Each structure stands twice: as C-alpha cells, then as structure tokens.
C-alpha cells in the first residue's frame, strides 16, 4: 500500500499527502456499505498513516494540526468513505479527551491510542440527547470507596464490539457528571449487538451496558461537575466536524453529477450551481475554524445538511435508474446523507431543515 507518506511516516491533512489514503478508502466504501462489516483495514490504514496524531499536540506525542487543517482532512476523508470518517470522529473525540486530562491512567494508554494499536470510543450521547427527558439518568454514578459505581447504559457507542477503551459519561444523583476512561474488558461491562442502520451499519454502533462497574479515582478524566461536556476538548457532540463530513459527502455526490455532465449538457448548470454552493460552504467552514464570523456554526450545519441531501438526490437523478440499483454510489450517498438529519443535530438545525423540506423557508 503506497500512501506516499513523508519520512516520518505521518500523513498531514493536505490533498497531496492524503491522496493515496483517500483513494484506498473510496475503493472500499461500496463493499463496506454492502457487507456492513467493521472496517478493520480502513482503520488500520488511518492509524498507520498517523491520522490519530493530528488531534494531539507534540508535547503528548501528536503533531498538533490546527482545527482548520483537521477539517480539511475530514473534508477529504468523508468524500471518500463516510463510514470510516464517522468512526474517526468518535475515536478521535475520545482520544482528544484522554490527552487533555491529567488523570493517572492517561500515560499508560495514550501512545497506543495515538498509534492506533488500541482504540477508544465515546459513550457520551446520553448526557445531551433525547433520553434526558426521562428525568432519570440512564447511566448513573454513585460515589463510594474513593471512586464511583456505574449502573445503566450508554445507547450509541461506535465500534463497541471492537474498541479497547471507552470514554463514558455518567451522572451523579445531585446532577453533577463525570467522564471516565474504562477498559472494555472491565468486570460488569457488556456490549449489545450493533444496531443495523439505514447507512453506516459498518460503524457497528450500539449500546454498552454497565452493571455495578467500579471506577477508580485514577480513571476519572473530568468531573464531578455540572455539564461536564461544556468546554471539554474532544468530548462535545457534533460541532464543525459534523458539518465537514456533510460537506465532504456533498463533494462526492457533486462529483458524480460532474462526471455525467461531460456527455450531458443539461447537467452542466445544476452541477456548477451545486459545486459553487459546496465551495462557499467549505470556505465558511474553514473561516469558522480560524475565528471568522461568516455565519454561525448552527447556520452552517443547516446549510451543510441541506446541501448533502440535495446533492446526493441530484446525483441519483443524474445517473437515472442505474443509481437505484443496489451497490451504486448514488444510492449509497442518498442514504448516508440522511444520517445528518439525526446525528448530533441541534433542535434549531432540525427545525430549519424541516422548514426547508416543508417549503416553509423564507
């Protein structure tokens, strides 16, 4: 596998350096979608290419890429394989949270996470999503014996049957929360079978359950505190990376239309309009990453969602009936685009997308 790596073996998130990796991911995206298998080889390729080191500073063993450069990398990766890119967001979110903590456990695990020899994922969605309306935490933490006792479950953990570690959030009865790093072979931790999804089934996302799981003090990454995710590096849900993945998927879909437009002049204008919109969204994304105020992150997320859905459906229309046959990339992109309507989607963004779909937008 020739990834055209520099002398240190670590690829930077630039187009020339990532080209070999993204071509490999793109070639495997269709078979991965069809099989629903865990992308072992793709994740290994990313680890060997140094992708995990983008997210951590050199003082902790990474290369400390800027937020804008990381988003540039995500734009390329998601245009190649959304399933692999989504998995990376969860793994690197966990990695960044581990690297930012002063917990005693960090030094024992960080290098293996950076190299991809060990994998960690996030179990935090229940702290911010719809389960909150139940009034009772679905994953509780009870103080005792110098640590905490966890009971309950985390409903959406990506790669749960394959990861070595989980960064998990739990809530104490008084409303404070903790983040902890636990090995998946810890007594009392069990994994449900992954949920079959409309797309991205290969992410093997499912529930992880905790039955009287003892957490020692040295495994507490953050907390106890109220809203432990607020300001937590790498542990927040959603964000600009989600918009980057949607814009990257749109890039791939528009590319299909552009291919068809070479021999069909009626597709030239739609392809050009969508490409221009995608370019503006990309520039606004990178502007936000560098402190610009071209728009709000929420506004960009709504636009990115819309662009992903419209461009993928336009690609399906452009390739006609062939795109409706199982295995065609246009059909896969249509299904994958719908993921952005439900993945870490803030309510104002949901409302904006609903208004557009119902022709209620101004």
Please give the residue ranges for each predicted region.
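A short core secondary-structure module
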Residues: 153-189
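Glycine-rich phosphate/cofactor-binding loops in nucleotide/flavin-utilizing enzymes
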Residues: 322-362
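Glycine-rich beta->alpha junctions and the first turn(s) of the following alpha-helix
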Residues: 195-279
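A generic N-terminal leader/anchor concept
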Residues: 1-64
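Buried hydrophobic positions in well-ordered alpha/beta secondary-structure cores of metabolic enzymes
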Residues: 73, 150-152, 180, 210, ...
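Amphipathic alpha-helix face/heptad-repeat signature
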Residues: 14, 243-246, 270-277, 300-307, ...
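Glycine-rich flavin
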Residues: 38-48, 52-151, 158, 358
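C-terminal helix-coil-helix/basic helical segment that borders enzyme active sites and/or dimer interfaces
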Residues: 26-34, 262, 276-325
């Amino acid at each position: 596998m020739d990834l055209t790596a520099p002398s240190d073996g670590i690829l930077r998130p630039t187009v020339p350096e990532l080209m070999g990796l993204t071509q490999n991911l793109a070639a495997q995206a269709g078979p991965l979608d069809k099989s629903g298998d865990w992308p072992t080889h793709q994740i290994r390729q990313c680890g060997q290419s140094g992708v995990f080191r983008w997210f951590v500073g050199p003082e902790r063993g990474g290369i400390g890429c800027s937020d804008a450069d990381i988003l540039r990398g995500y734009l390329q990766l998601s245009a190649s394989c959304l399933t692999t890119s989504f998995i990376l967001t969860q793994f690197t979110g966990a990695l960044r949270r581990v690297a930012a903590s002063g917990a005693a456990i960090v030094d024992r695990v960080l290098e293996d996470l950076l190299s991809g020899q060990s994998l960690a994922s996030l179990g935090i969605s229940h702290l911010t999503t719809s389960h909150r309306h139940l009034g009772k935490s679905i994953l509780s933490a009870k103080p005792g014996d110098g640590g905490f006792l966890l009971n309950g479950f985390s409903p959406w953990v990506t790669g749960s049957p394959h990861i070595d570690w989980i960064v998990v959030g739990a809530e104490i009865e008084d409303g404070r929360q903790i983040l902890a790093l636990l090995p998946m072979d810890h007594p009392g931790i069990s994994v449900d079978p992954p949920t079959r999804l409309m797309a991205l089934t290969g992410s093997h996302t499912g529930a992880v359950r905790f039955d009287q799981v003892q957490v020692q003090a040295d495994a507490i990454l953050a907390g106890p505190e109220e809203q432990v995710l607020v300001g937590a590096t790498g542990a927040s849900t959603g964000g600009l990376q989600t918009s980057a993945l949607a814009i990257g998927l749109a890039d791939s879909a528009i590319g299909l239309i552009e291919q068809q437009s070479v021999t069909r002049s009626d597709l030239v204008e739609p392809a050009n309009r969508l490409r221009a919109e995608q370019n503006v969204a990309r520039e606004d994304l990178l502007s936000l990453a560098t402190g610009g105020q071209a728009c709000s992150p929420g506004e960009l997320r709504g636009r990115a969602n819309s662009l992903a859905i419209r461009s993928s459906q336009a690609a399906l229309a452009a390739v006609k009936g062939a795109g409706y046959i199982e295995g065609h990339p246009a059909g896969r992109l249509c299904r994958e685009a719908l993921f952005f309507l439900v993945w870490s989607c803030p309510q104002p963004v949901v409302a904006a997308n609903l208004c557009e779909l119902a022709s209620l937008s101004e």
